[in-house]
């Protein structure tokens, strides 16, 4: 009770605490008014390092339709590689979608981006720890691991703060417990971004992830599709106001509304496979495949602009995040947006995106959605509903461990009251510009009612698919989403199990506390807790469970809350009273259920039992429960529990018990009549519990179911439906989701994949098988419930109450069926689990305790976390002890006693189990209440401390203001004085200037006169001096002329004398030369005469000789003539002579030729010698060449060998580098987790298990390069 009150108070306080306008300005704001709250965004910053410390920053951004963002950094939260990859994938898809969305609603993007991006992503990241991780390494590796245990955890944590944004997004704090498990799952795919961007309430989307909401949506999917289509129209009408992702908000919002429902639901399964509208269809085309892949993103962004709008918000948020987290946040935001969109759609009318979902989602879902069923039948049905309604459940189912499903209901949250509802200002697109005040065209209560109805319908549908797995349209769409999520979640679940590995505080103390409380009080408190949270949650269909509960508990109070949060806080304070009042206002049935949750369960059960019996009969007659039967059952339940039916989660809870009972009854009939009786008792108890839980289990159980708490409600409903005979399905899913809690994360992973396969092959058997694997270890069911709780962390109210209610229901159910059923479940997983129902209940109990522990770990604010741990641990210990004893007793009883006694013993055991379950539930509720109260106390203390600081600052500032005013007065007087002095100085200055001018003129005149006189004086003196100098120069010139004349005469006289001397010397030398010349002439003439005489003699001699020769010539000529005459007489002789001469010429020619030939021969000989030498050299070179070739061959062989060796070494090096990179990445991740807080450290064991899973990949990848070396 205190926890719920604290939640509501915190919601109110937070809402009032911060409000952010479109511009992103934060101001104190009381989000009582639903319209503003719609756009309000709340951020909860939880330091993972200090789980006890929780800072809740509540920001209401009317402009920003994206919901509140909760930043939760929990030590318990563990980030996984899958989460990272999931976020990456989301980032890519969401970024793309964001881009589209941004274009559609840039104002929204701009507004929300800076503010919410960090909050949403950071909150989820902080909450999940994975979100934080994504911000670091997380940046969400695209498509790598969309399903991440970390995400689930983060979602759970977020859901822990699942502020039921009834009026304000503040409810996230109140929904600590619920939001925890489901929020985690939701967050798994889009927790951070979707949260914020989607439906203004990141937390909301996380909460919505709960299986309750999924279930409700599932059922609603069938008939709400029309509603959803109508909401599509409504969004266009109130698009700016209500549908963030609606046609008006988004350009293609109208189509988007239905698509959002479907695709948000599917989106978890296939991130973008469902983009109906063209704007996001291309994204769908791209991401649809990815989504079909386990897309943790969760919400598949419908083609419609609305989804894009959500993504836009998500994108904005992610954009505002600076680091890798931004990408992660984009993804997360995308997820959140998608989830939010789906949730919003669900929440609005929860028209359940069913129409679009069935259209596109169904196609994809058939192939892979079965896998989701494999993961958990309940999960599958949830997934179906969720797929139809919102992929949150699927995210929880598929990727509850690591997948962040929260984003789906993020949008819903924003709507406060089904923010998604057409009335809500969920305008994520352009409508963001319009003030959020206008957003709430429909009252939060109406929106909540719509959402609840839709969720109820969805829940029914979801349950129907679970039990039936036949409704192809609903089941397949949800399955598709679930399948994708399941595929991803299998790994994520294992990791999620790691989240449960938190150190548990002393259980004894918690037990003592729980024991001190009255049983009914805790339940009422839990119900009230759950109810307030559901109310808040009902504000947003993502937190459909919480919002539904809110609506169920106080639809009118919701409007009251919107009108006056303070009144709501007061109501919360008087938790039981208000809860009763709320129930009264909403429905007397709801009040009765919440008050008489434990005792009234049988009463309600009787009414519901008949319906459930009918449903069970129908299910027994038809293994796949027909949608009609399920709907009929829901209608009956609605008649029995009108309020419950209004609150979708109540319907879901009721319907789930029916389905559970159906499958258990079937198996009970198969096994024995006793099992049938037990099942009937269980059904009665479960009906009561579910009716009772519908309020607080409605949201919580839905959240739990959606987030992966298939054991509590999901197990009861979805698991029991599909795996009721094989009750182990629920536990395995929970275990898988809570692999962080489980000791065998890898085993759980293995189980979850198997389960997924089985689900794809056959919904129930697969889920049962998975449950069996999970059931092998009872602690795992606890982890699973913990995981479930984690996933509804934001929907903490729903999750914890749902745990309590589910626990009580399951306890009742298990009590009816008997402890032997638990043993049977363990021994015979398929039948015993839900046959007896005790095992299911029992299983839920451990899960609940662990879920509580996990919720306590994750959601508690401040010391409340430790208390939660202690309480949950104590509960779990007692639960574990009880289960063992129960198991032992059933085994011994049937052996020792006859059948009748065995039946009696089983009945007594079932009663004991019911009582113990109620006790455990009450303890859990007490622990949850304590935790919530402590969280509220921490928040209040924080707010009070801040208020005191603000008051101190106000005082100091006021004093400073007074001082400044005094100083201002003094300064003003001083300024006036200075002004006067300045004026005086100005006048003096002007007078001085005039005087100066006058003096200047006078002095100039005087100076002119003075200088003129001086000038004249100087001129006269200058003239006088010039004349003097002229006279002096003239005298000097005359003197110089006289001296020159005298020197000239002297020089002329000396020159004449010299000339005479020279003439005499010349004449003497000339006479001498003439004499010498004459002598030489005479000698030469003598020589000439002599030579002439000698030459004449020679001439005479030669003439005589010439004559003699002439004579000889004549005689010779005569002789020749004579010979010629003789030759003429002998011609032969002449011929011979000629021949002789010719022969001589020929001989000469021949000789020349021979000489040339000799020369040539010499040359040839030389060439031959040279040739032989060259030949020898050639041979030598050839031999050398051959040797070199041989050596070259050897070298080539060696080089080839070396190259091959080098390639092998290079491959080995690459492998080692890859291994080193992986190890380094894992090491960084582990270090980051260690750095983020102790909560993540317990999850290391699952992380270690994840490492071995990756090592096989490395080992497998290594051989491939070795096989084909480069």
From Swiss-Prot:
The modification Phosphoserine is found at residues 381, 399, 443, 629, 1203, 1224, 1245, 1255, 1259, 1261, 1264, 1268. The keyword Coiled coil applies. GO terms for cellular component: centrosome; extracellular space; Golgi apparatus; microtubule; microtubule cytoskeleton; mitochondrion; nucleolus; nucleus. It is linked to Hepatocellular carcinoma: A primary malignant neoplasm of epithelial liver cells. The major risk factors for HCC are chronic hepatitis B virus (HBV) infection, chronic hepatitis C virus (HCV) infection, prolonged dietary aflatoxin exposure, alcoholic cirrhosis, and cirrhosis due to other causes. Cooperates with AGTR2 to inhibit ERK2 activation and cell proliferation. May be required for AGTR2 cell surface expression. Together with PTPN6, induces UBE2V2 expression upon angiotensin-II stimulation. Isoform 1 inhibits breast cancer cell proliferation, delays the progression of mitosis by prolonging metaphase and reduces tumor growth. It is found in: Mitochondrion; Golgi apparatus; Cell membrane; Nucleus. Transmembrane segments: none annotated. Residues 940-1231 form a coiled coil. GO terms for biological process: regulation of macrophage chemotaxis. Residues 533-556, 701-710, 759-776, 797-815, 1244-1270 have a biased composition (Polar residues). The lineage of its organism: Eukaryota, Metazoa, Chordata, Craniata, Vertebrata. Residues 38-50, 197-211 have a biased composition (Low complexity). The keyword Coiled coil applies. Ubiquitously expressed (at protein level). Highly expressed in brain. Down-regulated in ovarian carcinoma, pancreas carcinoma, colon carcinoma and head and neck squamous cell carcinoma (HNSCC). Isoform 1 is the major isoform in most peripheral tissues. Isoform 2 is abundant in most peripheral tissues. Isoform 3 is the major isoform in brain, female reproductive tissues, thyroid and heart. Within brain it is highly expressed in corpus callosum and pons. Isoform 6 is brain-specific, it is the major isoform in cerebellum and fetal brain. Residues 212-228 have a biased composition (Basic and acidic residues). The gene is MTUS1. GO terms for molecular function: microtubule binding. This is Microtubule-associated tumor suppressor 1. Belongs to the MTUS1 family. The modification Phosphothreonine is found at residue 186. Residues 1-14 have a biased composition (Acidic residues). It comes from the Eukaryota. Homodimer. Interacts with AGTR2. Interacts with PTPN6. Isoform 1 associates with microtubules. Residues 1-50, 184-236, 524-560, 592-622, 701-815, 1237-1270 are annotated as: Disordered. It comes from Homo sapiens. Keywords: Cell membrane, Coiled coil, Cytoplasm, Cytoskeleton, Disease variant, Golgi apparatus, Membrane, Microtubule, Mitochondrion, Nucleus, Phosphoprotein, Tumor suppressor.
